[in-house]
Amino acid sequence: MSAAAPAPQWLSTTLRWGPAQIPLQSNSRPVLSWTRDCFTAELPAPAGPVAATAAAVVVDDELARRLADACREPVPGTEMPAQSGAAEGMLLVRPVTEVISRRRPVDRSWPELIVFGLAPDGDWYALTTSDPLGPRAGELLARQLVERHLRRAGAATLHAAGAVLDGQAVLFAGDSGCGKTTLAAWAAARLGGYFLSGDKAGAYVSGGTAMAVGLAQPTRFGEGTLRSLLGEQWWQDKLPLPQLNQMMGTDRTGKVAPGPFKVVLSNAELAALGVRAASAAPLAALVIAAAGPAGEAAEVRRVPPGEALALVRPQLRSSWDLLPFGAGESAERRFGSTDGALASVLERVPVLVARWRPGHDDPAGVIMAVRDELS
């Protein structure tokens, strides 16, 4: 009779984000140390109160088994065969494009590899990327830990960009192309503020105060926004080298090719370019950015409280849109934001509508009009 396999020795550390303490466990000391370092490097300190959490994230192999069975093939990078058990603590490594393409086409460049894990409460996590030394390393873990923390706090996740001005956050929500990222970038780069988020942000109530939180998600910037951020014609020379293919539309030299493109930058990279970034701050207002009519000046107005929820509801988003789920089980159903979470925030902050034309109207003028409306 063969001896039983020894039980894995779990190691522990604590990820700290302001007052929040998030325990992390793994049976690999290098993974544990690297994860802690990546999390710390990706997230600047919050600028406001953040509730503490005690739920641990444990690296586990259950999702690895499920994907191996679904693929009917061995998992690259491991010894795990399809449709069989795996050793305790084994990590799954699969090309991320194979995982994401089952849900939707992906235009942006993603890291080549992701390691999946399962927390004790059943939450799935992508725990690392292919290059632990690259600028993308840790962003998935950081984002997911923050999102998990916010879900427990009853946060609403919004399709919104955000900036911090005078110690308070303003979230610019709206459909794609409405200029929300441009407004947030101008507030940070030109008006002495901090960049919070470019496409998705959380809002929740802590101790009676509405809070806005960025989700540690890199932002895609267009040429016009980047020029306004860096303030000169040759802004391309300031961008980090695309060692992880973070630029879309580059030629063989790594420089930006002619034509439309987006550049993907994290908040940490923005800070390296001289644009100050924040993780969280008390929320002052939520602004719905919308296209203004041609030939008319930009307009900012306050929304009556009774109309605010219906106006903001279309901008609610799921916290998770990356990991695979079972047939008929959507990320929105598991992790979607609720009207109750949003209503709790809107009871405490005003909602404004800013109608303007990106590329024609002055972003600084729109932001100053928002400030005037709130004063």
Model segments located where?
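A noncatalytic interaction/capping subdomain that flanks phosphate/NTP-handling catalytic cores
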Residues: M1-L171, S176, A189-L196, A201-S375
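Conserved lysine of the Walker
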Residues: K180
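Post-Walker A alpha-helix
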Residues: L183-A184
